[in-house]
Amino acid sequence: MKSQKIRIRLKAFDHHMLDQSAQKIVETARRTGASVAGPVPLPTEKSIYTILRSPHVNKDSREQFEMRTHKRLIDILEPNPKTVDALMRLDLPAGVDIEIKL
């Protein structure tokens, strides 16, 4: 019989907020008796946007902006119902995107 595993992927633009959220999840899972693997840092996505500085002329004058998306992966091995209930009640910041797979 295959043991159950919860895989949590976190994404955020601010890596400090992301690390705090990952730490909260790990502490909550360990407190309820589940074993945890992670948080594993995944590669950071970097999107670069180039725009013209001037609305009319000066094609050579451009400005570049970048947006970085930081990601973390947490595996909760052998979760019990208490672990799932505690994770459901966990309050995380709005800037962190959470994707959960069972």
UniProtKB/Swiss-Prot annotation:
Q: Which GO terms describe its biological process?
A: translation
Return the InterPro entries for the record.
Ribosomal_uS10, Ribosomal_uS10_CS, Ribosomal_uS10_dom, Ribosomal_uS10_dom_sf
Q: Which SUPFAM superfamilies match?
A: Ribosomal protein S10 (SSF54999)
Domain of life per record: Bacteria
In its UniProt record, a GO molecular function of this protein is: tRNA binding
UniProt xrefs under SMART domains: Ribosomal_S10 (SM01403)
Q: Which Pfam families match?
A: Ribosomal_S10 (PF00338)
- Keywords in alphabetical order: Ribonucleoprotein, Ribosomal protein
CC annotations in GO: ribonucleoprotein complex; ribosome
Cell inner membrane recorded as keyword: no
Give the multimer and partner information.
Part of the 30S ribosomal subunit.
What does this protein's UniProt record list under function?
Answer: Involved in the binding of tRNA to the ribosomes.
The protein's matches in PANTHER family, at most eight in alphabetical order, are given as:
30S RIBOSOMAL PROTEIN S10 FAMILY MEMBER (PTHR11700)
Its name, as the record gives it, is Small ribosomal subunit protein uS10
Organism taxonomic ancestry: Bacteria, Bacillati, Bacillota, Clostridia, Eubacteriales
